[in-house]
Amino acid sequence: MDPNTVSSFQVDCFLWHVRKQVADQELGDAPFLDRLRRDQKSLRGRGSTLGLNIETATRVGKQIVERILKEESDEALKMTMASAPASRYLTDMTIEEMSRDWFMLMPKQKVAGPLCIRMDQAIMDKNIILKANFSVIFDRLETLILLRAFTEEGAIVGEISPLPSLPGHTNEDVKNAIGVLIGGLEWNDNTVRVSKTLQRFAWRSSNENGRPPLTPKQKRKMARTIRSEVRRNKMAD
């Protein structure tokens, strides 16, 4: 096993422990608590994959961090902080919308890289909007926390979430997963649009209505449908 993989996991475990202490003292805001919950699942998955005990890894991670801080000068720390790019946390959903349980009559699940896509295939002929909470850096999506699909009535009918066992994903991973979710929902004649925040940072190839352009496959299917409709109309005449 790569020693850097192990040490990275150990440090992540300790830093999560520190953030948990901050949360326990009620010093964390909503984005902080969101990331804390997601990272806990991620660490459990990584620990299982690596075969490492989280408690033991946390202790070793503490030793690594303490050694680094002991060697780090205040001036070097200031320079590091000044040169590090700052990310922003953007929210389409409330805490209630993010934490709400939801159920599927006809569940479908697909794994796309490090992301899990879930949708209810029983949903038909609905107007649906995709909303997400995520961080942004350099005007691009950095980390997806959670994306959900809502009907006009507020029901959750789809979701994209990071896989705890496969931490890390790219902007393209998210974009591809959004395309899969939209395609699945539109297959049942649902009308899907994307929130303005997602349009700006994660789904740039959309039209002014917040809907993605048709793929070549969708265009061919639509052309066949139109031709069939024209033929039927001519026969009726």
Swiss-Prot record:
Ubl conjugation keyword on record: yes
Disordered as annotated region, ranges: 205-237
S-S bridge residues: none
UniProt motif Nuclear export signal: location: 137-146
Top-level taxonomic group: Viruses
Keywords, sorted A to Z: Eukaryotic host gene expression shutoff by virus, Host cytoplasm, Host gene expression shutoff by virus, Host mRNA suppression by virus, Host nucleus, Host-virus interaction, Inhibition of host innate immune response by virus, Inhibition of host interferon signaling pathway by virus, Inhibition of host PKR by virus, Inhibition of host pre-mRNA processing by virus, Inhibition of host RIG-I by virus, Inhibition of host RLR pathway by virus, Interferon antiviral system evasion, RNA-binding, Ubl conjugation, Viral immunoevasion
Basic and acidic residues compositional bias, start-end: 226-237
Modification note: Upon interferon induction, ISGylated via host HERC5; this results in the impairment of NS1 interaction with RNA targets due to its inability to form homodimers and to interact with host EIF2AK2/PKR.
An example Gene Ontology biological process: symbiont-mediated suppression of host gene expression
Single GO term (MF): protein serine/threonine kinase inhibitor activity
Region (RNA-binding and homodimerization): 1-73
Segments carrying motif Nuclear localization signal: 34-38
Compartment list: Host nucleus; Host cytoplasm
Ranges where the record places region PABPN1-binding: 223-230
Region (CPSF4-binding): 180-215
One Gene Ontology term, aspect cellular component: host cell cytoplasm
Functional summary from the UniProt entry: Inhibits post-transcriptional processing of cellular pre-mRNA, by binding and inhibiting two cellular proteins that are required for the 3'-end processing of cellular pre-mRNAs: the 30 kDa cleavage and polyadenylation specificity factor/CPSF4 and the poly(A)-binding protein 2/PABPN1. In turn, unprocessed 3' end pre-mRNAs accumulate in the host nucleus and are no longer exported to the cytoplasm. Cellular protein synthesis is thereby shut off very early after virus infection.
Subunit structure: Homodimer. Interacts with host TRIM25 (via coiled coil); this interaction specifically inhibits TRIM25 multimerization and TRIM25-mediated RIGI CARD ubiquitination. Interacts with human EIF2AK2/PKR, CPSF4, IVNS1ABP and PABPN1.
Domain remark from Swiss-Prot or TrEMBL: The dsRNA-binding region is required for suppression of RNA silencing.
HAMAP family per record: INFV_NS1
Protein name: Non-structural protein 1
Species of the source: Influenza A virus (strain A/Malaysia:Malaya/302/1954 H1N1)
